[in-house]
Regions:
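N-proximal low-complexity "stem/linker" segments adjacent to membrane-targeting elements
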Residues: 1-49
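Short, acidic, metal-binding catalytic loop of nucleotide-sugar glycosyltransferases
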Residues: 48-57
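A conserved acidic beta->alpha catalytic loop
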Residues: 49, 64-73, 114
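Glycine-rich, basic loop-to-helix element that forms the pyrophosphate-binding segment
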Residues: 85-102
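Short aromatic/hydrophobic "clamp" motif used to bind/position activated sugar donors
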Residues: 107
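Conserved donor NDP-sugar-binding/catalytic core segment of glycosyltransferases
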Residues: 119-150
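Acidic donor-binding loop at a coil-to-helix junction in glycosyltransferase catalytic cores
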Residues: 193-202
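Active-site-adjacent helix/loop segment of glycosyltransferases
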Residues: 211, 218-295
Length: 321
């Protein structure tokens, strides 16, 4: 499709969704699913913002993945229905269990450390009504814990979704995204903690659905308080996710799987800096550059570790397996 046609289509979808917001009925028939593991400090706020939607959800399900803290009790007190995993399922498996238990026509995934905009479900419903090809709706990600490491996590991991106009996406993080159940079909999450949302989005898109980014939806990420150690660990996990998804799926960056030596050029770092500069964040980009480079180094380490582990598994796998 030509760029001019794509731009026109984006504008038409955005205009139709704005009209539909005003005409939305006072019910969403959405099941909000929140996977949770040891999130007692943030889960109550996530549940409360889900219940406080201008278009109330049908239910809020918290899937407790063997927490060792008071997450279940806190979520119950906040008004959620808590379902406990009988064994460790990871974030992907917890979401699968939530989908199996949910009764809504819309499946709204929310992370346990997110405070969501009160118009989240209303705007998603409006987009679905305006364009039947839309399978999922995400929004603008905001760092809820300002500071060096919170900013670094936002820019390195979510720079694609921090601003801009309404547009089509190839994927969207499950920290706050609404899917139509009929668009999901048999798709399910890999039972892992990284890359599972990308695999899920790709499976839904393979069925013909499309993912819409609505910047009017505000997703406030109240992630754990990061320090240098946890920041490094998160970026290594992000590198693992990059390897696993690019190995299996046709996504931007697939060339890195085929030619990992290109990682030495730090391609993702330059993309992040370009997005920051395009949004006028010159001073912040310069201030954070050494830390952004360190985080990108950790991502490369994670990518290469996952690649090495994958190659070792292939070598050790018995013939015919």
């Amino acid at each position: 499709m030509r760029p001019a046609v794509q731009a026109s289509e984006r504008t038409q979808t955005a205009m139709r969704s704005e009209r539909a917001v005003a005409a939305s009925a006072p019910e969403s028939n959405a099941s909000v699913i929140i996977p949770c593991r040891n999130a007692a400090g943030t889960i109550a706020a996530a549940v409360r913002t889900a219940l406080a939607q201008s278009l109330p959800p049908l239910e809020v399900l918290v899937i407790d993945d063997e927490s060792t803290d008071d997450s279940s009790a806190v979520a119950t007190a906040a008004g959620a229905r808590v379902i406990r995993c009988e064994q460790r399922r990871n974030a992907g498996g917890a979401r699968n269990l939530g989908m199996a238990q949910a009764s809504g026509d819309l499946i709204a995934f929310l992370d346990a450390d997110v405070e969501i905009d009160a118009q989240w479900l209303a705007r998603a419903v409006a987009v679905f009504r305006s364009d039947s090809s839309v399978a999922a709706v995400g929004g603008r990600i905001i760092n809820g814990r300002p500071g060096r490491f919170g900013d670094l996590d936002l820019y390195l991991n979510h720079s694609e979704w921090i601003s801009g106009t309404g547009r089509w996406c190839t994927t969207f993080p499950t920290m706050a995204v609404v899917y139509r159940r009929d668009a999901i079909g048999p798709a399910h999450f890999p039972e892992t903690n990284y890359g599972e949302d990308t695999f899920f989005a790709h499976a839904v898109r393979a069925r013909g659905g499309r993912i819409w980014f609505d910047p009017a939806i505000r997703i406030v990420h109240m992630h754990e308080r990061l320090d240098a150690r946890t920041f490094w660990s998160r970026q290594i996990d992000a590198g693992r996710q990059l390897y696993l998804t690019r190995r299996a799926l046709k996504l931007p960056g697939k060339v890195l799987y085929r030619a990992p030596m290109l990682l030495a050029l730090y391609p993702h770092l330059w993309i992040v800096l370009y997005r920051m500069l395009r949004r006028g964040m010159v001073v912040k980009a310069l201030k954070l550059f050494p830390w952004l480079a360190a985080g990108e180094t950790a991502r490369i380490v994670g990518f290469l570790r996952a690649r090495r582990e994958s190659q070792r598994d292939i070598v050790m796998r018995p013939e015919g397996v």
